[in-house]
Amino acid sequence: MKNNLPPFIEIYRALIATPSISATEEALDQSNESLINLLAGWFRDLGFNVEVQPVPDTRHKFNLLASTGHGAGGLLLAGHTDTVPFDDGRWTRDPFTLTEHDNKLYGLGTADMKGFFAFILDALRDVDVTTLKKPLYILATADEETSMAGARYFAETTQLRPDCAIIGEPTSLQPIRAHKGHMSNAIRIQGQSGHSSDPARGVNAIELMHDAIGRIMQLRDLLKERYHFEAFTVPYPTLNLGAIHGGDASNRICACCELHMDIRPLPGMTLNDLNGLLGEALAPVSERWPGRLTVSELHPPIPGYECPPDHKLVQVVEKLLGAQTDVVNYCTEAPFIQTLCPTLVLGPGSINQAHQPDEYLETRFIKPTRELISQVVHHFCWH
């Protein structure tokens, strides 16, 4: 089928050359509009209908949905367009110039995960999409590396219900059917300052936090005892105390203390239940010291995710790859896409290269990834 798509490596090169960093720090954050426009042109050239969706409450970020075919069901291939920032002093190559060396493609986003769209486009370049018996959707999202705002908004607003979805995160082509979630909170104690020579005239926030931490440790033990998912290498929800700040002088009663913590829930645990358990753990401190303890989110929470192991998608992909599905501890957009349809996480490149200086994708993934995309499209959109 005739089209004007550039060669695979030139598509890859153009994607890497188009910066699309997402960061909580405004000075580093970038719009992904230029990258979305690139993808829109290429998918239109293949005969897809393209919708560009502004994502609310972001700094000029967009989702893209390319669709072709008719009827219900079908297949969704998804990925995010953004990358993390880069540490200029630790890269030995230009992060925005695709460099091939020693059977590796170097550049920011080669593995995580702008390159996945180059594989999709290349796998479809010779396909007459008008002959599909079921729909094929390509979703490109924004801000996965920070808030996952793009996937959240798409899942909340779309009417699409594909038969199944694949998110092309770097899994070394090992299919992933489940991962833990992530919830991070700030616990803040507001005390009353005063001179350390007269403790009764103040309320020491560090002492109150000591009480709160003891109860949080009891919650950690409870989570470990009560909840299990044996497929994970760490088969229980983890709770970590990551940072604490409080006080300003040894001779002053501490007026404020703040603890940052996270919990990584198992699939099947709801965020509401988890918040309830945290609230119950801290209730004695709140009751004894009314108005002095607050809990706030550091980042929007991400639930755990699991694709049913007996679903057709799992069976088909395991047969195509000759590999069993696995589970991982890191988070993806899968919990949000899973609300629409059964979802697997599966893509080229290693997660060990994600967020690293001199990020790369090994060229050994090129041929099997093209073949896999062609096979899953054929199976779910032509059968």
Curated annotation (Swiss-Prot):
Query: Which sites bind Zn(2+) 1?
Result: 80, 112, 169
User: What are the GO cellular component annotations?
Assistant: cytoplasm
Q: Which UniProt keywords apply?
A: Amino-acid biosynthesis, Arginine biosynthesis, Cobalt, Cytoplasm, Hydrolase, Metal-binding, Zinc
- Enumerate the cofactors the protein uses: Zn(2+); Co(2+); glutathione
Name the chemical reaction catalysed here.
Answer: N(2)-acetyl-L-ornithine + H2O = L-ornithine + acetate
EC code(s) of this entry: 3.5.1.16
Q: Where in the cell is it found?
A: Cytoplasm
Gene Ontology terms: biological process: L-arginine biosynthetic process
State which pathway it belongs to: Amino-acid biosynthesis; L-arginine biosynthesis; L-ornithine from N(2)-acetyl-L-ornithine (linear): step 1/1
Protein family membership: Belongs to the peptidase M20A family. ArgE subfamily.
* Protein function: Catalyzes the hydrolysis of the amide bond of N(2)-acetylated L-amino acids. Cleaves the acetyl group from N-acetyl-L-ornithine to form L-ornithine, an intermediate in L-arginine biosynthesis pathway, and a branchpoint in the synthesis of polyamines.
The record's section on NCBIfam families has: AcOrn-deacetyl, PRK05111.1
* Protein name according to UniProt: Acetylornithine deacetylase
Biological classification of the source: Bacteria, Pseudomonadati, Pseudomonadota, Gammaproteobacteria, Enterobacterales
| Encoding gene (name) | argE
